[in-house]
Amino acid sequence: VPDSNTDGRTRVYHVPSIASIGAPTVAELNAGTQIDTLMTPDGLVGFEPDTGDVDNSKLSSTFNTVAAGRVSFSGTMLRLIKQTGTDTLYNTLVYGFATNVVVRRDVTSTTAWAAADKVEVYPVQCGEVRNLAPEGNAVHKYEVMTKITTQPNLRATVA
């Protein structure tokens, strides 16, 4: 079985309004804004879940056992490239702005949304923008902290 290459195969949108994060519609997604075209290659930061441990060992146990506990995310953010002139994305993703980060993986990023697409939907509130230190031979980069406000749907299907 061949490996799945991620180059050019991750689509990321910010979508302010989704009625059901388990089944976002093509119309809702098309009303959002594509942001993967303004992200650095490592710009989708911290959107990997971690599962806590619940110690369920017994006093009589001779082996420590655990069960799956709460799921959490840590340090989620978007690392983006600043645009010259009017930068709509920079001016939109401001402190307190609520939106949904929608991620589709393993399909060419230029492929339009379609019913039955598998996506991840993260309801977030933006933190303060952090402009990164200037570097030689580099573009102006900035980060937007994203606070996940309700449980995301990591296996949503586009309706």
For the regions a protein language model found, what residue spans apply to each?
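Hydrophobic transmembrane signal anchors and adjacent membrane-proximal interface regions, especially
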Residues: 12, 71, 95, 119-121, ...
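Surface-exposed flexible segments
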Residues: 24-33, 90-97, 111-129
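Structured, beta-strand-rich domain cores
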Residues: 55-113
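Compositionally biased, intrinsically disordered linkers/stalks adjacent to structured regions
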Residues: 22, 30-32, 147-158
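Short beta-strand and beta-hairpin "edge-sheet" elements
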Residues: 105-155
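Short intrinsically disordered coil segments
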Residues: 92-97, 141-143, 158-159
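Solvent-exposed edge beta-strands and adjacent loop segments
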Residues: 1-79, 125-140
